[in-house]
Amino acid sequence: MFRKAILIIHGFAGGTYDEEYLSNSLEFVKNFDVFSFTLPGHESRKDKATRADWIQSARNHVEMLINHGYKDIYVIGHSMGGVIASIVASEYKEIKKVVLAAAAFQYLNSGSNKTNVKELASLIKRNVIDYSAEEIFSRFLKMPLNSLKEFMSIVKENQDVIKSVDAPILILHGKNDKLVPLTSSRYIYNNVKSKSKIYYKIKGVNHDIFNSKRKEEICEIIIKFLKKNHKCIIEEEI
């Protein structure tokens, strides 16, 4: 099949609505078929989904695309979805390109991923106060403590997975992100196996990257990356 499948994976406490503008933009691109899904436990806050459920759900969607004949699959992951996208990219040869937006290999500004659940909840509350109660922080607070624990575990347990990702990769991170620090994308850039890697630090953009004031420009960057073959190493502030 000559058409390309694009699989978008949303972040923790989020949903497909976070990437709706991106999805709509990609659907207008010739030969792109766009797919997204809601991670288990995110349809209802009462669900007790685990990190294994999140990862398996992504695997199931990748395998569904393979079974439908797609030979070229591009994955886009936002926040925790970036960690999950990296996991499946390391496992399936059919995944030919990867886009990671504010991928949460680290979180908040605790200085460590060893923070416990109560400390993380406290950090979230403090950030809500300090940064004008951004919607995404508020969503975090509505998630069960067990889900927060699962989020912390998926990050901690998959620190090395990026070292097995060898597909061309585009890394995007807003410079005003208060949830996932820039050091997370720096870690990805320094450790990814890919020989072709592009890292853009984007001025004036927070964690909600696909709904920011620069969302149109960001989508254009992603489309350009997915349409063309890149063999380059770029790190730039834009």
Regions found by a protein language model. Give the residues of each.
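Catalytic active-site module of serine/aspartate enzymes centered on a nucleophile-bearing elbow/loop
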Residues: 204-238
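Gly/Ala-rich beta-loop-alpha elbow adjacent to hydrolase catalytic centers
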Residues: 77-81, 85
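Short beta-strand/loop motif that positions the catalytic acidic residue
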Residues: 165, 171-173, 177
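Catalytic histidine neighborhood in serine/cysteine hydrolases
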Residues: 190-208
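The serine-hydrolase catalytic nucleophile loop
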Residues: 12-24
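Short alpha-helix in the alpha/beta-hydrolase fold that links the catalytic acid
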Residues: 21-22, 167, 181-190
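Conserved alpha/beta-hydrolase
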Residues: 27-46
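Acidic catalytic loop of the alpha/beta-hydrolase fold
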Residues: 176-180, 208
